[in-house]
Amino acid sequence: MMMVLRNLSMEPTFALLGFTDYPKLQIPLFLVFLLMYVITVVGNLGMIIIIKINPKFHTPMYFFLSHLSFVDFCYSSIVTPKLLENLVMADKSIFYFSCMMQYFLSCTAVVTESFLLAVMAYDRFVAICNPLLYTVAMSQRLCALLVAGSYLWGMFGPLVLLCYALRLNFSGPNVINHFFCEYTALISVSGSDILIPHLLLFSFATFNEMCTLLIILTSYVFIFVTVLKIRSVSGRHKAFSTWASHLTSITIFHGTILFLYCVPNSKNSRQTVKVASVFYTVVNPMLNPLIYSLRNKDVKDAFWKLIHTQVPFH
């Protein structure tokens, strides 16, 4: 506890090296990431608003989707602004407390999203495999508990890792070779022994991935078998459309997490890690609302209706 208080009182400063060292790429990358961030904010907030104001979407599936959009919006807003700032500003410093909070909030969002994706897979399993029991099985109380559990567990692991990070000694030079305060990059600049934090991170990441992917894969095996039994071509197409959109999001998100955190003794270069990190910090939050809305006629119709309502055409 004394070590934690001492670290907070001394307030060391970190420097984020950013995404690239090449000056000629910084402005083009700034414009690309800015566009992606705008799409992310508009897409996710738009999804939340559409689900909130339209009674047609007051169902468990859209309830979970609204929370997924909220987590994506928060996560992108935690990471991307600092990424954009470092691409155009000479001063790349970040205070100790700000860095720790960025790590904690971003990691919380990642873990929460992984469990929300598992919850959404289970929801689709119940809807497709047991449609007659869907409204009973997926009650409002159960949906609220599943979402609350995702948020609470999303905070638990990152909080434990944060406690260990706060005990580390950062005496400088505190240069983080990343575009945000990612945990492995953050603790690597410490002068303390970081074996335990690394083992904890690997254990938490592996446990979370095993649990969520087991739920997801089991759900989709049953979904796939059930869909093959559907005689109606339109019904089979609709079921596969929902399945495919969810699977696309899962592949991008979990594939990156497995690559970065669940492969021990990885020899990947730091630049490779940065590029991979972009997929789950910038690309995935942007794609999720596009994936779900472009494959959903009801969402597209509601979106254009909202646009025409708010922006009258003469």
Swiss-Prot record:
Could you list which ranges are Cytoplasmic topological domains? 49-56, 123-141, 220-239, 295-314
Per its UniProt entry, which superkingdom is the organism in? Eukaryota
Query: Which Gene Ontology terms of cellular component type are present?
Result: plasma membrane
Show the PROSITE patterns listed in the entry: G_PROTEIN_RECEP_F1_1, G_PROTEIN_RECEP_F1_2
Extracellular face of the membrane: 1-27, 78-101, 163-198, 261-273
Sorted keywords for this record are: Cell membrane, G-protein coupled receptor, Glycoprotein, Membrane, Olfaction, Receptor, Sensory transduction, Transducer, Transmembrane, Transmembrane helix
Attached carbohydrates are found at N7, N169
Membrane topology, as annotated, equals: Multi-pass membrane protein
Where does the protein principally reside?
membrane
UniProt key word Membrane = yes
A single Gene Ontology MF term assigned here is: G protein-coupled receptor activity
Q: Name one Pfam family in it.
A: 7tm_4
Task: Give the UniProt record's GO annotations in the biological process aspect.
Answer: G protein-coupled receptor signaling pathway; sensory perception of smell
Question: Can you tell me where the transmembrane regions are?
Answer: 28-48, 57-77, 102-122, 142-162, 199-219, 240-260, 274-294
Check the record and name the InterPro entries matching this protein.
GPCR_Rhodpsn, GPCR_Rhodpsn_7TM, Olfact_rcpt
Question: Can you say where in the cell this protein is located?
Answer: Cell membrane
The family this protein is said to belong to: Belongs to the G-protein coupled receptor 1 family.
* General function of this protein: Odorant receptor.
What name goes with this protein?
Olfactory receptor 5D14
Please name the source species: Homo sapiens
State the gene name recorded for this protein. Answer: OR5D14
